[in-house]
Amino acid sequence: MRTSLIALAAALISVTSAGAQTVVIVRHGEKVDTSSDPALSAAGEARAAALAAALRGAGVSTVIATPLKRTRSTAQPTAAAAGLTVTSIGFDGGQPIHVAAVAALARQAPATATVLVVGHSNTVPEIARALGDADPQPLTDCDFDRMTVIQLGAGAPKVVHARYGAPTSAC
C-alpha cells in the first residue's frame, strides 16, 4: 500500500500548480454485498482510510458523494480529516443531471482547492469526462483502486490516471 500512496502523491504533485484547482475522482470502496445500499466491507473501510491519508495536506475544500452509504462512507474519512462535511448530490432527474451537478459544484470550489468526488462505476468516467478528461477510464464492478486526478486552470485540463490503496482483484 505504501507504493500506492507514493504513486498517488506523485500523481497529485504532477498535476498541481499554483492557481489551479485539482479534482480527485474515485469510485466508492469495496462493499459488503450487492444490495441496493450496502455498507463498506473491511477492505472498503481500509481503502477509505488510505484515501484520507493520501489526501491529507492536499488542501481538500470540498467533498462530494452520492447519498448512498458506500460513497458517503468512502468520502467521510477525508472530509473529517479536512474538517468538512460530505456534500450529497442525488440522482433526481437521472444520471446526466447528476453528472452535470457534480461537475458544476466541483468547478465552484476555490481556484487553488482540491475537490474529492466519490462516485460509482457508471458515474466516475462520466464525471471525469464532464470535467475535461478526453479519455476517461471505464470501470468494471471490480475496480475500486482507480482514481482520476484532473487539474483545472488556464488551458486544457491536465489528467492523470492513478491507483491508490490495495490493488483490487480482477472479476
Which sequence ranges carry the predicted segments?
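Bacterial N-terminal signal peptides
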Residues: I6-V15
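Active-site-proximal alpha-helix that buttresses catalytic centers in soluble enzyme cores
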Residues: A20-P110, V124-C171
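Acidic/histidine-rich alpha-helical segments that form the ligand environment
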Residues: A113-L116
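Short beta-strand segments
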Residues: V118-H120
